[in-house]
């Protein structure tokens, strides 16, 4: 094939140009993201039961829905929360690769079976089914410079005019409002109701009748009488629009003609739909929209669309209102991609300089350089064909591929120059002869490197999704690299190169003259050293055994992890006050947190967005969350200004607040996989022991974890503590004896204390809700319940104290379930110096000491880490086996591949040493670096073994003579290609700033592995080849 293109160079150029054009078109169309879709697809079901406590919600809503979610394809696990705000969220997580649209449809179908079994109030509120990630893509905050504008005003405008618009954008999975839109609030006065012998039930019934929209028909509607000349719609009763109209609602007309109206027994106002949340941006009243990404959507495209839409809406905002982005994960995505692209160009420049150093011929250097854009652009075309995106992982693959793809072209050019010098042939003939010598080695190298990376593509879970990005990118680049080396590079050599003399390098002066002289002396010294080594192979095999033993020790001692942490420019702070703490107390702590960040960390913090009443641990008055946005990376130089350093200082200072727990934490490397770094542990009641037993087990586990501060830190329940609850018990026999309806009792309790949604009203053209509830002063104390009255069958007003008793109990404001069983989520982090894998192992060990019937499981990113840890050994083993089989097929020998494979531990030991010295961990990126090193180590060995084998078979050389000739001939291309690769990944290894954690994790390991593989392999490969050939003749 090479000879065909040597004779037809324009044909080769045409193919290369077509490939580059396809790649250029692909780049314009490929989406850009930080990561591909790595997190397993998830579908969430949300419902609301106004006024219900957590236990009631769990028993009447959560379990009913869960029990119908059976038989759904590819369901991995299911978790749910039920809280005392009456809300329930059930999240179903599916195996990677599941079509999220199909999953959503299946969940909706199952939900249809459960819906008729749910309370009427829940059905009336509506049940939503969304496919979205569990964490926020961004938070859009809205503040006003107008001092008269309240949070309710801002919230209502955002809810009415912005929220739905953003929800409809492509890529948006869910939009959560931090605030509430307006609602008509009827605040009942219990004393006045009793005075007029009215009940909340009377109020609700009259509102349903009088605040109603009637379809009244038409005058002259069809069928009409012959000759009818009039047709008009009839508008009869319509819904009310303002508090004045509601105040005039007639509750009762007395026999004397007097009228009791709603305003006589209640306060009517346009208030908030709920008062659960207080939002602030840098201490100013605000509203916020927490935007979650739809499953499979592109983060950058979605964020760009959101900002464009808000910019479009900005001119229509009320005077003084503006939008800010106090929490945005996308700048990190953009900058990290930019950093990798910059690294890509730096790698190309360094590789060019290495090639010019060794080749010292601009024409010769230009040939491998031309191969770089051809192969890289071609790889983009293949990524587009596979439906991939331009993301951190594919770009890492490109950076690794640069060193690999120029290798093939360098081998071709270097060998053509050598043949021209030694055989004094013109370029065309030299190229033909050269290609006949190295074509087998090129194919062998391609097979080996492909064999290393292809098994990665077949692994499951989120880890498999990461591996596939590298696998497809690198294998595509390798395949194209070999094709270019067999098609374009020979054609370029035959047309661009000029004949060179045998004294080509010796005639150079200056730096190149010194370099060539030094290198030639080194080659002679190296060849003599190899000759001596081959005379005492036993000693070196012993040294090799010690190296392998050291490799095993290093591997066992290397801490494990899933992905490295990153400074993403944002982080979160969770606030948890003691059970029963009020919203007012929580706000004071949030104000302290805001003051700390804006004053003590003003050099690093851009803004703080706080939400009172909301937390990832649940919605309650004693919970809060702060979204902290840091200043741009270029303004935060130095480790002391990194997100990790800011979080560490905040933990120390905010930990001194006595009124509650304040826990700052970093975002996970892949936001889709959770909300916090560290581990995510589910403690499960497997035997139906009950909430109290599960709580005791949780506290026991937390106590045991606290005894290991050297390994575990910030171990905490991701939930709300049990709190005092006021239990009201109705004596049904007494109630019936008094002629009181049980349904009236229930409706009165629900309305007065929890609030009842009645129906809707029209506010400025938008439908909003109408709520009835007792005014605040009538529901503050236990004795206020006794002031509630219901009317008996004979018209007498009966106080609740006549048929109820009450007492205090403890209960949870938030109940959790995992896979249909009661559970409690526990989060924590590995202590500095401890790997996440070791921390997880310790948690499992502690959990095994809990009482019988208490089980555990991992969820979120920890589930994926456990899965990846189990896959890693199999991945390395399969890669070893496949490489060996490919080499056996290439050499038609079972023994020669052994001499190649024996060199692999020499590269692995370098990866492990580098990782140990620079505090890297055994994570997914480490495994990619390890596999890359396996392939590259084998590549160097192939260059020597292939030549030695040919010299023995074609020229009849002895095994030692052939080996010495091979190492002498191949040392230059081995060092050149290895140095090119090492310098190609150097920018990754020394990177800092956005995305540097991942870049370092890849670069440091590969660089260390390549250094050791090169320095050790050039001495050990000859030993392995000679020993194997002697042991296995032929």
Curated annotation (Swiss-Prot):
Residues 29-339, 386-391, 461-473, 557-871, 918-923, 993-1005 are periplasmic. Keywords: Cell inner membrane, Cell membrane, Membrane, Transmembrane, Transmembrane helix, Transport. Belongs to the resistance-nodulation-cell division (RND) (TC 2.A.6) family. One of its GO terms (molecular function) is xenobiotic transmembrane transporter activity. InterPro entries: AcrB_DN_DC_subdom (IPR027463), Acrflvin-R (IPR001036), MdtF-like (IPR004764). Residues 1-9, 360-365, 414-441, 497-537, 892-897, 946-973, 1029-1034 are cytoplasmic. Part of the tripartite efflux system AcrEF-TolC, which is composed of an inner membrane transporter, AcrF, a periplasmic membrane fusion protein, AcrE, and an outer membrane component, TolC. The complex forms a large protein conduit and can translocate molecules across both the inner and outer membranes. One of its GO terms (cellular component) is efflux pump complex. Pfam families: ACR_tran (PF00873). It is a multi-pass membrane protein. Induction: Induced by LeuO, part of the acrEF operon. This is Multidrug export protein AcrF. The gene is acrF. The chain crosses the membrane at residues 10-28, 340-359, 366-385, 392-413, 442-460, 474-496, 538-556, 872-891, 898-917, 924-945, 974-992, 1006-1028. Part of the tripartite efflux system AcrEF-TolC. Involved in the efflux of indole and organic solvents. One of its GO terms (biological process) is xenobiotic detoxification by transmembrane export across the cell outer membrane. It is found in: Cell inner membrane.
